[in-house]
Structure formats: C-alpha cells, structure tokens
C-alpha cells in the first residue's frame, strides 16, 4: 500500500495533484465528468479586482508539443467570484481550494486578497506575479527581486492563510526572485508559469495571436520547469509547487524528485479533460514500479 499524501504549507492533501489556474475553470465544470474530490486541491481561475474581458481573438495558437495562449486573465471579478463561483464550487468540492489572484497594482492585489480572505474554503492564496499576457503593470512585479518582495510583503499583511507566489520563467534569475518572495513572507512558491512565445501566419505574414505574443505551455517546457524547480529547491526553505508540461504520473515523480511538494497540471487538462483523474489513478502504479512507498519522502530526492 502506497501513501500519496503530502503536506503543502501546513495543509495535508490526499495527493500532490492540483489542476493549474486557467486550465480548469472554477472547478465545478469538471465535476460533471468525474468526482473532483479525488484531487489534492485545485487552483481556480485567476481572479482580479475588477471584471476582465480578456484579450481580443485569436487567443490560442497550437504548436508542436504545446500551445500558445493569450487569454488575458478573463474573469468576472472578485465580487462575482465570491458570490457566485465559490458557492458553486463548494457544492461539489469538499476540500480546501487554492485562490489564484492577479492584479495590476499593489492596491489591486491587496484588495482582491482581502475580499477573498474570509472564505473558509480557501486553503491557500496563489498570487500570480508572472502572467505575461496582459497590458499593464502586472508583469513588473515578477521580473525583479525588489518588486517581487514588495508585493509579497503587501499581500502578507492582509492574510494569515498560506501564501504561495507564482513565478515567471521569463526572467534572468528565477532563484533570486524566489528568495525575495521567501524574504517577503511567502509560505511557498509555484513555478513555472508559461514561457513567452510567438507564432507567425505565413500567408498573412502577421503574428497568429491578436496579442502578438502569448504564453507557451505543454510537454515541451517540462525540462525547463524541472531545471528551475531543482535550482529553487536548493535556494529556499519554503515548499515548491512545480508545474510546466505535466501530463503523466512519471512527470509528477520527476518534479517531486527535483524538489516540488505538489504538482500542478495545466495544458494537459485542455487536451484531455480527464488528465488529472488519469494521473491520480496511475500514481500508485508508478510508485510501485519505482519502489516508492511514501511520496513525501522523495521530495528533493534528486539532490
């Protein structure tokens, strides 16, 4: 009998599998397909202070081994998320949920977290300082250690819930930014967000995406993500949520050996809506294959 339980920032979860924000809606949509309570947790759709309609179309471009997206944080805004979306999720999900939050100023980040903080079902905040697909100041918080630490401190002051900062790979040194978030009071970091990319339509001789650039995700980015998780694990003492190209139980084990406590599944959900269920079902089989009895014991095992 294998043990898939892990403890993320003081909260025990049944397994390390968490659908990544932006690929799983608000979660309840997937409850029509399978019992989502098999998940470790879920990170619901990125939430901003005000409603956002997102970027103009086309927003998606298929690529070999992945996809580009420039959705632009489309969401109904924090007030509707709180009054409409979370209650719908609560009806079908009885575990702590992860609230993914983004913003374009310190005020927006802080106010959004403040408004969600009273929700008892939120087990963690995942603060996205790295989304590359919006116009405005959101990206700047994740591109320097100073700004990353400042936004972490600001949000830390308004919540006692575990605070996980989501990091961008589109930086010179992700390790220094992770350390800055830790210094600012983060309880954990999640990485990586998407890699900035572009595709060009050969007939039109124009970028395919209306936004021109977008975030590249899918299996091709996994080696980059594993490398960054490995590097960050050596530099910080807080837990890491790893993500980037995960589509199999073997990928989950690889991320955990690199240093991840939990693992988010993103683009795979868009290709196969049963991806998280399949990975969770396969995990004990893969653990047996590699002689793993307790998942929590392999965290950082490749170091």
Question: Where in this protein do the model-derived segments appear?
Answer:
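N-terminal capping/small domains of soluble enzymes
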Residues: 1-97, 102-104
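Hydrophobic faces of well-ordered beta-strands that scaffold small-molecule active sites
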Residues: 17-20, 40-44, 97-101, 125-127, ...
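Glycine-rich beta-to-alpha transition loops that act as phosphate-gripper elements at the mouths
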Residues: 24, 100-103, 167-173, 222, ...
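Catalytic cores of alpha/beta
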Residues: 28-34, 109-119, 171-184, 234-236, ...
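Glycine-rich phosphate-binding active-site loops on the catalytic face of alpha/beta enzymes
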Residues: 43-49, 129-131, 188-198, 245-246, ...
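C-terminal helical cap(s) of enzyme catalytic domains, especially alpha/beta-barrels
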Residues: 55-64, 200-214, 256, 268-293
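Glycine/Thr-rich beta-alpha phosphate-binding loop at enzyme active sites
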Residues: 67, 132-146, 177-234, 238
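Conserved alpha/beta-domain cores
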Residues: 90, 101-161, 167, 175-192, ...
């Amino acid at each position: 009998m294998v043990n898939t339980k892990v403890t993320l920032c003081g909260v025990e979860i049944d397994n390390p599998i968490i659908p990544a924000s932006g690929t799983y809606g608000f979660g309840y949509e997937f409850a029509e397909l399978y019992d989502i309570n098999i998940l470790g947790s879920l990170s619901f759709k990125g939430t901003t202070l005000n409603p956002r309609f997102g970027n103009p179309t086309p927003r998606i471009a298929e690529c070999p081994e992945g996809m580009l997206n420039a959705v632009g944080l489309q969401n109904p805004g924090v007030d509707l998320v709180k009054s409409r979306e979370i209650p719908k999720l609560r009806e079908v999900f009885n575990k702590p949920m992860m609230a993914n939050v983004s913003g374009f100023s310190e005020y927006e980040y802080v106010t959004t977290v403040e408004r969600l903080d009273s929700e008892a079902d939120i087990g963690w905040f995942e603060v996205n300082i790295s989304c590359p697909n919006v116009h405005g100041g959101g990206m700047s918080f994740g591109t320097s250690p100073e700004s990353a630490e400042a936004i972490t401190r600001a949000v830390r002051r308004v919540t006692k819930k575990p605070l996980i900062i989501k990091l961008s790979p589109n930086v010179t040194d992700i390790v220094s930014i992770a350390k800055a978030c830790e210094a600012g009071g983060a309880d954990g970091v999640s990485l990586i967000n998407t890699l900035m990319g572009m595709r060009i339509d050969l007939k039109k001789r124009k970028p395919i995406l209306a936004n021109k650039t977008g975030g590249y995700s899918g299996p091709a980015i996994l080696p980059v993500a594993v490398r960054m998780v490995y590097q960050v694990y050596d530099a910080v003492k807080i837990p890491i949520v790893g993500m980037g190209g995960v589509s199999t139980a073997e990928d989950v084990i690889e991320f955990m050996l690199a240093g991840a406590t939990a693992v988010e599944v993103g683009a795979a959900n868009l290709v196969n809506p049963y991806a998280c269920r399949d990975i969770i079902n396969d995990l004990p089989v893969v653990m047996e294959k590699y002689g793993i009895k307790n998942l929590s014991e392999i965290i950082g095992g490749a170091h």
